[in-house]
Amino acid sequence: MIKNDLFLKALKGETVQRPPVWMMRQAGRYLPEFIALRDKYDFFTRCQTPELAAEITVQPIRRIAPDAAILFSDILVVPQAMGIEVLMKENVGPFLPNPIRTIQDVERVIVPDVHQTLGYVFDAIKLTKQMLNDEVPLIGFAGSPWTIMCYAVEGQGSKSFDKAKGFCFSHPEAAHVLLQKITDTTIAYLTEKVKAGCNAIQIFDSWGGMLSPVDYQEFSWKYINQIIEALADITPVIVFGKGCWFALGEMGKSKASALGVDWTCSPRHARYLSGGNITLQGNFDPSRLLSPIPVIKKMVHEMIDEFGKDKYIVNLGHGILPNIPVDHAKAFVDAVKEYNQ
């Protein structure tokens, strides 16, 4: 039994004394102990070495004590497993030297045996669960098929992902074949993550907001929903779409347990758009953690008041930034724990 099950209760929509709190990218570059390991080991060594991934996962639990842990990994381990080369340039981001640009490129992409290609992730989960000792739940995650495809086609990060969008619009059949391959791999991967010990799953649709509402349905939501349908009976699923407020109504009708919201959509509007029944997660502007600590705490309490304490998970509206002072991150978590006291 998980000792602190606030997060799991919120996912079920149960009444809680206070909402749970965790932060996207909480195992990250704002922590000096994370920087110490980053300086010794390259990015994918940290991801692919279970002992390192587990240690990085529990660092924020020790330091700022959120109500859930999220496994240290990366969304791009999935395309790596599918035979797409992925490099990570420190302080720059991902670089894929052989981007997918043709139908022939799509045909070369494999749907792998996830045990053979991603076994290190499942080993990291088992090790992390031992280290957590059932203190808090463990979240596993994956990128949405559309977001993975953005990197696979673009070859790197982008402000517009026009190459990825152009591929969808000029070669829609090939795009759908690629999206389905990514979806099938992701379902197998996340299923094994749950079997290995993850208590919930989050799907990151980081670039969903790049699409129009109509294109979002065709190229992103259709595939996210396949993943939800495949997993909903075995684990709670959270969907976070950055800039995807326009899809909250559709998402709210799905079997997802919770929906992540970014800071551009107000709590009340998010409740209204999502239908008012599903648990919401978010949506503190990560840059706001640079505010003075009393301001952070005041704003967190106001945010909880607006969302309501039930069917709500306190989080940021995107990942925590590397330049956030640790005591400010801890103040964010502490503010939630002080709510209603």
From Swiss-Prot:
One of its GO terms (biological process) is protoporphyrinogen IX biosynthetic process. It catalyses: uroporphyrinogen III + 4 H(+) = coproporphyrinogen III + 4 CO2. The record marks 74 as: Transition state stabilizer. Its EC number is 4.1.1.37. Its main location: cytoplasm. Pfam families: URO-D. It is found in: Cytoplasm. GO terms for cellular component: cytosol. The keyword Chaperone does not apply. One of its GO terms (molecular function) is uroporphyrinogen decarboxylase activity. InterPro entries: UROD/MetE-like_sf (IPR038071), Uroporphyrinogen_deCO2ase_HemE (IPR006361), Uroporphyrinogen_deCOase (IPR000257). Substrate binds at residues 25-29, 44, 74, 151, 206, 318. The keyword Lyase applies. It is an enzyme of class 4 (lyase). Keywords: Cytoplasm, Decarboxylase, Lyase, Porphyrin biosynthesis. Pathway: Porphyrin-containing compound metabolism; protoporphyrin-IX biosynthesis; coproporphyrinogen-III from 5-aminolevulinate: step 4/4. It comes from the Bacteria. SUPFAM superfamilies: UROD/MetE-like. Homodimer. Catalyzes the decarboxylation of four acetate groups of uroporphyrinogen-III to yield coproporphyrinogen-III. NCBIfam families: hemE. Belongs to the uroporphyrinogen decarboxylase family. PANTHER family: METHYLTETRAHYDROFOLATE:HOMOCYSTEINE METHYLTRANSFERASE RELATED (PTHR21091), UROPORPHYRINOGEN DECARBOXYLASE (PTHR21091:SF169). This is Uroporphyrinogen decarboxylase. It comes from Flavobacterium psychrophilum (strain ATCC 49511 / DSM 21280 / CIP 103535 / JIP02/86). The lineage of its organism: Bacteria, Pseudomonadati, Bacteroidota, Flavobacteriia, Flavobacteriales. The gene is hemE.
